[in-house]
Amino acid sequence: MEIGKQTRLSRPHRLSESSKVYRWADQANNLLQGLNEQRQHGQMCDVVLVADDQRIPAHRALLAVSSPYFQAMFTLGMREEHESEIELVGASYVGVKAVIDFLYSGNLPLDGGNIDYVLETAHLLQVWQAVDFCCQYLEKEVREDNYLYLQELALLYSLDRLDAFIDRFILKHFSTLAITSEFLQDVRMFKLCAYLSSEQVQCLNEETLFEVAFKWLKQKPERLEFALQLLSNIRFALIPFYLLKYYVLPNLHSLLPLDTSCKVLVEEAIDYHRKLSAQPVMQTQRTGLRGGVECLLLLGGEVSERGEGLSAEVCWLDEEAGKWVEETKMPAPRSQHCVAVLGGFIFTAGGSCSPDNGGDSASDMLYRYDPRRCHWIKGAPMNQRRVDFYLGTMGECLIAVGGRNDSGPLSSVEVYHPADDHWTYVAELPKFTYGHAGTIHKGIVYISGGHDYQIGPYRHDMLSYDPKTADAWNECQAMILARGWHSMASLEDRIYAIGGSDDHEDSMERFDVLEVEAFDPQTNQWTMIAPLRYASSEAGLAVLNRKIYVLGGYSWETMDFSQGTQVFDPDKEQWTLGPNLPKHIAGPSCVCLIEPELIDSIDTE
């Protein structure tokens, strides 16, 4: 073999033809480390950056791939493309050195002494990762004594991330920040409009928001031209009537004696307060709760604990804590009553005022609850006293279907018109019906099952009422199982009939129905699905976050009241157990309602 001449060795065995890629994991880090060492020793560098008369050597290629600013400078025919020294006019040496060091090392030391220089330079050179790190640093530094300065910094450099963070900070602490002279003097008009219109602004009440807007307008005469734009964000309907009339209007008149447009906003709210019963059908952007969250509420019922009878408690489910919290009390204890939501208000109607429910103690009372002020008012009573009936929201009205009272089972149906606070009869049911269940599905009223007399088996029937087509009840496909004292729910494209009880035909002995069936109006078919975990006649039901909640109830076989919560997930087609109720209870009502959000629930993170 000749010296220095390579030869190919013959293979004794054939190698595999399959390929494999090997990765040098540290190659990029080693490359940058090597380039940085060259730069520190002044080796292989082909450009010098000058700032504050100090020089920083670098590699054009690395600058170009790391910064759109340098990429354009070195490739678009600018004179700097061929210069060995480039002066960065207006840039500080502290900022340039920190950013260039960052491009080579990936490390960006930040502190109160260099942050302004680094941010300015990183923004100039369009090194956006460095800009983002500056924003992260500044977010940790936001306090009540510097947030306005940092907001101006964010606006100056178009730092959307920092700007949004400061907005959340201001919204969370609005009650304390907005009354300071610094805020009233320096906050920009478009920012204040955004805060006053926000669903997340944290403030004790709407009158305080008006006070902030009013004081901001008074700061400078030139601000008055923005009065309508600013005050349009105040929800005057949430301010008490007496304050609107004796505080808000006089102050507006003194500030804007010739203006009429702003006064119209207040007069609209005064009219809203005067039409008390019509408020549910007068809802607009300026009447709704700010930042409300949907909550599951449990109202009333019959309690099995010794010494207790009917409950007037209204509790809401704290999902995070997994417990029920009392919010208020109904005007009177009730069970077997019905509730519905219209225009953000709870209506509770009828029910029994005695544990001995049989119709003799049926009520005709209607009450309305306003979550904005935790306040109950009385509405016009129903034309007939009702217990064991159905109440639903139908457009801008409520509909009460069937039930019973001291005269016996009912077939009558009546509709409540909140605009003028009165009830009118509509088409009655084809049979006396009580102990049935109902739901509203895509604007149509459905009721199923129930009883017509004191004895005998329960019914399979399902009826529908569509006021848009005719004032009449129509027969639908009957349920697979007869049942009464059950629950119904509408969720997406299906209607559910849940639990209840029935009587054996031969012995008239009551038994629990755990089966659950789902109805598809498109195919007109019922399908059996996963049964309940345990019996639940006379339970409360509501739909929250695409899940069906069945609360409490009664077992006719064991004669026990339930304290449990059963939750149905339609995606998994299964029932799970939720947080226990405060007490063992049957005959409650449940509803989901938009409630005020707790101040501490808003986070700036």
Swiss-Prot record:
Protein's UniProt keywords contain Repeat: yes
Domain BACK: 147-248
Gene3D superfamilies: 1.25.40.420, Kelch-type beta propeller (2.120.10.80), Potassium Channel Kv1.1, Chain A (3.30.710.10)
Protein's GO biological process: protein ubiquitination
Keyword Electron transport (UniProt): no
Cross-referenced SUPFAM superfamilies: Kelch motif (SSF117281), POZ domain (SSF54695)
Positions of transmembrane segments: none
GO function terms (MF aspect): cullin family protein binding
Keywords: Kelch repeat, Repeat, Ubl conjugation pathway
Highest taxon listed in the record's lineage: Eukaryota
Residue ranges of every copy of the BTB domain listed in the record: 45-112
Pfam families noted in UniProt: BACK, BTB, Kelch_1, Kelch_KLHDC2_KLHL20_DRC7
InterPro entries, per database record: BACK (IPR011705), BTB-kelch_protein (IPR017096), BTB/POZ_dom (IPR000210), Kelch-typ_b-propeller (IPR015915), Kelch_1 (IPR006652), SKP1/BTB/POZ_sf (IPR011333)
The protein's annotated pathway: Protein modification; protein ubiquitination
Mapped Kelch repeat ranges: 295-344, 346-396, 397-443, 445-493, 494-546, 547-595
Reported function: Probable substrate-specific adapter of an E3 ubiquitin-protein ligase complex which mediates the ubiquitination and subsequent proteasomal degradation of target proteins.
UniProt protein name: Kelch-like protein 36
Originating organism: Danio rerio (Zebrafish)
Gene name, Swiss-Prot/TrEMBL: klhl36
